[in-house]
Amino acid sequence: MADPGGPVEVRLVIAARPGTIFRYFTDPARFARWMGESSVLDPEPGGRLRVGYPTGQVAGGRVVAVEPDRRIVFTWGYEGDGQAVPAGSSTVEIILEPVAGGTEVRLRHAGLPSGEPPAAHLAGWRHALAALAYAGSAEQLAPVLGERVGDWLAAWNEPDAVRRDELLGRCLADGGRFRDPTTAVDGARQLAEHIGMVQRLTGGARLAGRGAPEACHGLVRFGWAAVGPDQTVLATGTNVAEADLDGRFRWVTGFWDPLPHRPEPAERF
């Protein structure tokens, strides 16, 4: 929101816990990851703030207040003569609030001159918070992402029903759903039954991962290949999933790569 006579305000829900997000204000390497390589923030009252832009412009200010995992306030403006918003002349407050699905980040930029167009500041802060969200959400998932994808693939290959249920319980959130061109199931029970049917129909084919999984704003993408007993690749594709804060999938959607002479779904049964 940008009121010509008031502060600039931006809100964004990030798929990460407040403690994860707050590290991007207190750790120098993490701060530079979302604010730019030459950016510096000393996260103590009176600490220095410096943000360098690719154009050569530099923003500067001082930290005013810090509440761990919840709030940080700093002054803001631009270095150099003749700046409409001189360094340290305005104030930015950022509040982190835990919400379902992660953290709501509320940014308020106040003290801008009355004649200063707010649109550029609004666009700039939206861009910055998007970079923060990308980095923070990826870090939230990083410790468990490979394991969750591994459990998903292992569940499709597991012949023992009890063990299959255990694997799905680790990688699928309660009520999680799965969709692909021939499948629409809701919950671990339906998915386990579907996997059992696929195993019977495919005669020993196995699901293998292709490449490293990727995360973006709480979404996950990972490739797969269906491999026959003789190691022939029968099909390939990509799954896209939404993960909760523990890395379990709320939903998974599978996309198949084109294959010549692929049978229509009705011919597969």
Where are these regions (language model features)?
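A beta-strand edge to alpha-helix "cap/lid" segment located at domain peripheries
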Residues: 82-134, 198-269
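Hydrophobic pocket/interface hotspot
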Residues: 21, 31, 49, 63, ...
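Short beta-strand segments that buttress and anchor functional surface loops
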Residues: 49-54, 74-79, 221-229
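Short acidic N-proximal helix/loop "leader" segments that mark the beginning
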Residues: 1-9, 139
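Amphipathic alpha-helical segments
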Residues: 15-34, 169
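Short acidic-aromatic low-complexity motifs
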Residues: 15-19, 142-171
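A solvent-exposed, acidic/Ser-Thr-rich amphipathic alpha-helical stretch
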Residues: 18, 37-52, 59-61, 67, ...
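Glycine-centered tight beta-turn/hairpin loop motif at sheet-sheet or coil-to-beta transitions
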Residues: 5, 54-56, 230-232
